[in-house]
């Protein structure tokens, strides 16, 4: 395995300087503060600036279609993360836009994709239902055909970014009598349609997500993606991307795991805890040194786990490491970012509050472990039926 640094040409270095200057200009401390206060993980001014500068289109497109070359793509990804660009809404937008490009009509592609590249059109995910849990195929939101339109009724949970988006990538049930994977149809529903109500929810880590209600929402058939009852085919690729079940590129110029953005918060928290222990002298206590070393080792190991394995390893490490850091640092570590007296400027507190959610986003840890067991280890499906009680 080659661990040498990739060679940067003069043009690559100029691009690095350009990106750093651009991000420093637009991702200001005020932007970061506002993002913490709203929990949106989105800033419209920054997003539109990224679109106007051509960065969104270059990130979305392949190199063959005019996107970033591999080295510059990696530079862009790393610098965007270092600058703490509010990114979640662009993540869902880029993911859904690929389904629009693959399954949408030419008219729909022309309506949506130019705005995606300029930043004026954002797309969110309408997957989870209040009673659906992690199994998105158990969809109860109904779409009933009425001539050239569809009437949609139902509700979705955790539609993050809906209040900042123009369309939702919506799973609907169009044949309740069919098997669940044969009953789904996907739509790209305009969020300004009559009958849509968006209600905000704040999660324990401070992020905002949404419940979205659909009451007799009429959607033209041109907003359908793929075949009627063929939604699982449309949905499979974005689900694989969200799960991290994608093949790695052989050049190594990419994140090892899909959860790297979140993992960096954990790495920073461990570094800060170790620095505080070093300054206070508590690291001389062998139990403290051991726990810090264990935390660092867990972080390092999880950062090196690829694909869907990394998603599980990072989420579990965050759940295990964060309470240990809080215990080592004491009560002042419970103060959030920007609070006077926070021992580590809120790093451990944020990871502690974020950790439970990492094991839920995009599917639970149990779902991912089952996927690894079935598709990697070749084991059978788990049996959740109650044990048979033998009677004499």
Regions found by a protein language model. Name each.
Residues 1-90, 111, 115, 337-340, ...:
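Amphipathic, small/basic residue-rich leader segments at the start of a protein or domain
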Residues 4-8, 197-302, 358, 391-392:
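Glycine-rich beta->alpha junctions and the first turn(s) of the following alpha-helix
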Residues 5, 71, 76, 236-237, ...:
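Glycine-rich phosphate/cofactor-binding loops in nucleotide/flavin-utilizing enzymes
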Residues 31-38, 282, 286-289, 293-343:
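C-terminal helix-coil-helix/basic helical segment that borders enzyme active sites and/or dimer interfaces
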Residues 51-119, 160-167, 299, 303-310, ...:
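Internal helix-loop-helix
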Residues 119-127:
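A short, Trp-centered hydrophobic/proline-enriched beta-strand micro-motif
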Residues 141-144:
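A structural signal for short hydrophobic beta-strand segments in well-ordered beta-sheet cores
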Residues 148, 153-197:
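A short core secondary-structure module
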